[in-house]
A protein has these predicted regions:
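Beta-loop-alpha module in the N-terminal Rossmann-like domain of NAD(P)-dependent dehydrogenases
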Residues: 37, 44, 96-104, 117-124, ...
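Hydrophobic packing residues within well-ordered alpha-helices of enzyme cores
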Residues: 4, 76-79, 105, 125, ...
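General beta-strand structural signal in soluble alpha/beta enzymes
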Residues: 66, 94-96, 115-117, 136-138
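ALDH superfamily catalytic-core signature
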Residues: 87, 112, 120-182
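PLP-dependent aminotransferase-like
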Residues: 32, 50-102
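A structured beta-alpha segment of the ubiquitous adenosine-cofactor-binding alpha/beta core
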Residues: 26-27, 94-111
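N-terminal Rossmann NAD(P)-binding subdomain characteristic of aldehyde/semialdehyde dehydrogenases
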Residues: 1-54, 87, 91-93
C-alpha cells in the first residue's frame, strides 16, 4: 500500500499542467491518458513488478492489459482480482499464456507497452511495436556495477556485494554483476 501511495503521489505530480511563457505568449500543457496499456512482467517479482509497471498507467487514467509471466499466472490473476475490487469494471484485464499470447498483445491495438525481461524478447517487442508507432518502456536486464570508492567501509561493501549479488538466487535485474574498486 505504501508503494502504491508513493507511485500515486509521483504520477499526480508528474501529470500537473505545465505552464511556460516567453513574456508574450503563454502555453499550458495538459497530459491526457494514452488509452490501453499492455504490461508484460517477469516471474521473479510477480506482484512487485506489475505494481511498478502497471500502477502509473492506471493512476494516469489508462486501462491495462496485464500479462504475467507464464511461470506465475495464478499470482497475476489473484493480484488483478485484488485491484479489481476497487477499479471500475474492465479497467484492468489479465492475459495469461506463453510468448505467443505476449506477441498477440504487442501486435494488438494498445498505445503503450511496458516490458521487463530478456533482451531477445525486448527486440521482438520493439520490432512489432514500431510498426504501430506504439510507445514502449523496456527494462532488459542490467549489468549493474557496484562502485567502491576509496573512503568506503570495505566490510559493509563486501557484505552488500555478497548479499546483492545472490538476492533471489542472483536473478534480479539490478543484482551486482561486477565490482569496481576505485
Amino acid at each position: 500500500v505504501t508503494s502504491i501511495s508513493r507511485i500515486a503521489d509521483e504520477v499526480v505530480e508528474a501529470l500537473k499542467p505545465e505552464e511556460t511563457t516567453d513574456g508574450v505568449t503563454r502555453t499550458i500543457s495538459y497530459w491526457d491518458p494514452l488509452g490501453v496499456c499492455a504490461c508484460i512482467t517477469p516471474w521473479n517479482f510477480p506482484m512487485g513488478m506489475p505494481q511498478t509497471l502497471m500502477m502509473p498507467s492506471l493512476i494516469a487514467g489508462n486501462t491495462a492489459l496485464f500479462k504475467p509471466s507464464e511461470e506465475v499466472p495464478l499470482v497475476g490473476i489473484e493480484y488483478a482480482k485484488i485491484l479489481n475490487k476497487t477499479l471500475p469494471s474492465d479497467v484492468l484485464q489479465v492475459v495469461v499464456g506463453t510468448g505467443e499470447q505476449g506477441r498477440e498483445l504487442v501486435e494488438s491495438d494498445v498505445q503503450l507497452i511496458t516490458f521487463t525481461g530478456s533482451q531477445a524478447t525486448g527486440k521482438h517487442i520493439l520490432e512489432h511495436a514500431g510498426k504501430g508507432l506504439k510507445r514502449v518502456l523496456l527494462e532488459l536486464g542490467g549489468k549493474d556495477p557496484l562502485i567502491i570508492l576509496e573512503d568506503a567501509d570495505l566490510d559493509a561493501a563486501a557484505k552488500f556485494a555478497a548479499s546483492n549479488s545472490f538476492r533471489n538466487t542472483g536473478q534480479v535485474c539490478v543484482s551486482t554483476e561486477k565490482i569496481f574498486v576505485m
